[in-house]
From Swiss-Prot:
GO terms for cellular component: large ribosomal subunit. GO terms for molecular function: rRNA binding; structural constituent of ribosome; transferase activity. HAMAP family: Ribosomal_uL2_B. InterPro entries: NA-bd_OB-fold, Rib_uL2_dom2, Ribosomal_uL2, Ribosomal_uL2_bac/org-type, Ribosomal_uL2_C, Ribosomal_uL2_CS, Ribosomal_uL2_dom3, Ribosomal_uL2_RNA-bd_dom. One of the primary rRNA binding proteins. Required for association of the 30S and 50S subunits to form the 70S ribosome, for tRNA binding and peptide bond formation. It has been suggested to have peptidyltransferase activity; this is somewhat controversial. Makes several contacts with the 16S rRNA in the 70S ribosome. The gene is rplB. Residues 255-276 have a biased composition (Basic residues). Residues 208-276 are annotated as: Disordered. This is Large ribosomal subunit protein uL2. The keyword Ribosomal protein applies. Belongs to the universal ribosomal protein uL2 family. PROSITE patterns: RIBOSOMAL_L2.
Length: 276
């Protein structure tokens, strides 16, 4: 997939780039795999904003994705490659021999007509197949990795993401993430072979505010542009700096301050991510 540019018939359109849709083959989605999700726009059940800078965005339907990949021993053929408005990678429509159809994340190199399968072991190491981590050879690139057996893939699901299987220790395997983090995952967990497709997405330039509004992202107002009643950085004459380290509207340190809480799974992280 290539990055495409646009003719600058408006000033904002000059800098917009997008990913070519030449890989998309589907004319329509499978209706039984579509569901309407309510738009919360960052509000809780009381209607109060709990996550700022969010809105409904463009109208869209959610595609039900098979993250579990537990349909063992039944081969499926890739019927179509589709666009998914809820994620930045493409999805592949798989038609299984028993007649069932499911969506999976499209790994790099998977195309229409290819055959994929899921099993505990014994499959070829090719994009789209899924196996338990204990049966995948060391050095293999994987994605859509479970953290709890049977729960479905939770890690490595966005466009261009991947992890590499570095070793095996008793009931755990060691994975190296793209960030450089080394992490243990239970060997009974499932993972899909290959790197997630649409890797050019990271090079896309949004280009104008309206495009983010379609994605459901509202503008962010700087704290220094507010009044003192609204933000700790507010007030002052002209463009005066805040005179303090960056904080949130509620006075908590931000912009680089570590906020991650300690939890039991911390012991599974062998080495932290490396700075880029």
């Amino acid at each position: 997939m290539a990055i495409k540019t646009y003719k600058p018939y408006t000033p904002s359109r000059r800098y917009i780039t997008g990913v070519s849709s030449e890989d998309i083959t589907a004319k329509a989605s499978v209706r039984s795999l579509l569901v309407k999700l309510p738009a919360h726009a960052g509000r809780n059940n009381n209607g109060r904003i709990t996550s700022r800078h969010k809105e409904a965005g463009a109208k869209k339907l959610y595609r039900i994705i098979d993250f579990k990949r537990r349909k063992f021993g039944i081969e499926g053929k890739v019927e179509a490659i589709e666009y998914d408005p809820y994620r930045n990678c493409r999805i592949a429509l798989i038609s299984y021999r028993d007649g069932e159809k499911r969506y999976i994340l499209q790994p790099k190199g998977l195309g229409v007509g290819d055959v994929v399968c899921a099993a505990e072991s014994g499959l070829d190491i090719k994009p789209g197949n899924a196996m338990k981590l204990r049966n995948i050879p060391v050095g293999t690139i994987v994605h859509n990795i479970e953290l709890k057996p049977g729960k479905g893939g939770q890690m490595i699901r966005s466009a261009g993401a991947y992890a590499q299987l570095m070793g095996k220790e008793e009931k755990y395997v060691i994975l190296r993430l793209a960030s450089g983090e080394m992490r243990q995952v239970l060997a009974e967990c499932m993972a899909s072979i290959g790197e997630v497709g649409n890797e050019e997405w990271s090079n896309v330039t949004i280009g104008k505010a309206g495009r983010n509004r379609h994605r459901g992202i509202r503008p962010q107002t700087r704290g220094s542009a507010m009044n003192p009643v609204d933000h700790p950085h507010g007030g002052g004459e002209g463009k005066k700096n805040s005179g303090r380290h960056p904080v949130t509207p509620w006075g908590k340190p931000t912009k680089g301050a570590k906020t991650r809480r300690k939890k039991a799974s911390d012991k599974l992280i062998i080495s932290r991510r490396k700075g880029k």
